[in-house]
From Swiss-Prot:
DNA binds at R291, R310, R312, R315. Mg(2+) binds at T66. It is found in: Cytoplasm. This is Holliday junction branch migration complex subunit RuvB. GO terms for cellular component: cytoplasm; Holliday junction resolvase complex. HAMAP family: DNA_HJ_migration_RuvB. The lineage of its organism: Bacteria, Bacillati, Bacillota, Bacilli, Lactobacillales. Homohexamer. Forms an RuvA(8)-RuvB(12)-Holliday junction (HJ) complex. HJ DNA is sandwiched between 2 RuvA tetramers; dsDNA enters through RuvA and exits via RuvB. An RuvB hexamer assembles on each DNA strand where it exits the tetramer. Each RuvB hexamer is contacted by two RuvA subunits (via domain III) on 2 adjacent RuvB subunits; this complex drives branch migration. In the full resolvosome a probable DNA-RuvA(4)-RuvB(12)-RuvC(2) complex forms which resolves the HJ. The RuvA-RuvB-RuvC complex processes Holliday junction (HJ) DNA during genetic recombination and DNA repair, while the RuvA-RuvB complex plays an important role in the rescue of blocked DNA replication forks via replication fork reversal (RFR). RuvA specifically binds to HJ cruciform DNA, conferring on it an open structure. The RuvB hexamer acts as an ATP-dependent pump, pulling dsDNA into and through the RuvAB complex. RuvB forms 2 homohexamers on either side of HJ DNA bound by 1 or 2 RuvA tetramers; 4 subunits per hexamer contact DNA at a time. Has 3 domains, the large (RuvB-L) and small ATPase (RuvB-S) domains and the C-terminal head (RuvB-H) domain. The head domain binds DNA, while the ATPase domains jointly bind ATP, ADP or are empty depending on the state of the subunit in the translocation cycle. During a single DNA translocation step the structure of each domain remains the same, but their relative positions change. Residues 255-332 are annotated as: Head domain (RuvB-H). Its main location: cytoplasm. Pfam families: AAA_lid_4, RuvB_C, RuvB_N.
Amino acid sequence: MARILDNDVMGNEEFSDRTLRPQYLREYIGQDKVKEQFAIFIEAAKRRDESLDHVLLFGPPGLGKTTMAFVIANELGVNLKQTSGPAVEKAGDLVAILNELEPGDILFIDEIHRMPMSVEEVLYSAMEDFYIDIMIGAGDTSRSIHLDLPPFTLIGATTRAGMLSNPLRARFGITGHMEYYQEKDLTEIVERTATIFEIKIDHEAARKLACRSRGTPRIANRLLKRVRDYAQIIGDGIITAQITDRALTMLDVDREGLDYIDQKILRTMIEMYQGGPVGLGTLSVNIAEERNTVEEMYEPYLIQKGFLMRTRTGRVATQKAYRHLGYPYQNT
């Protein structure tokens, strides 16, 4: 069952994300360091009438990597063609996409770390020298065809930058690290979304939503919609701080943005293993979740908020986790 705090896109959220997507850097809320850098790089490329260097965007899900790719295309005034690593299964799939590019176009590859190595290798010459050599036919009848490509910009997005090969990573001239959002930026995003969807919300309610959104706009917007539902049925349709607290309590989202699964992880470590260290496999069995799910979906936020530490001997619940859940802390 999907969690309301999942970073991945749910249901019809792809349409919602497009509706809310800013078009230009001046409209993009948050990620100030990345925006400042890109504003300079984009303007320099435009003045030289050149394609922008290839861009790698990396960071946790839901932080606006896809949105930033579209913003870059709009700022440059060029077309963007979109695909994903898993969708490009064969080298021929990528060649077909590259062959359709016009001068200056952007090719956006989401989840680029999941692209097969045989496909990735086609990108090397395409990115560096704007050509590809492909083999057609088989056996004695096979031959190589050289295809020149127009200058283009590849934007790759990944949640797992460490999984990129060194040759691919080295071909990106620009990198953008998308970080978790600050409370003030998320509050502004909640208020902007409320305005677009004509939802009535006061500032304190928006701030409370932002505090519990795990630093992620996608989660903030999802929680806003669920609190709106609660306000319409239980209240008078206006989202107040009190309504927000009651709705999020009903949804099992606490003041730190932890849900019942996050709390279950920490409680299991504290109650059964004296806070740890606990091996990932042992922890996964105890909470009935897959190892990868625990490592990729739950742990990053718990670590970022200081509730959990990864050590060489296993996972350890911090003093902050004890305090947050109301357990006495014993420093052994």
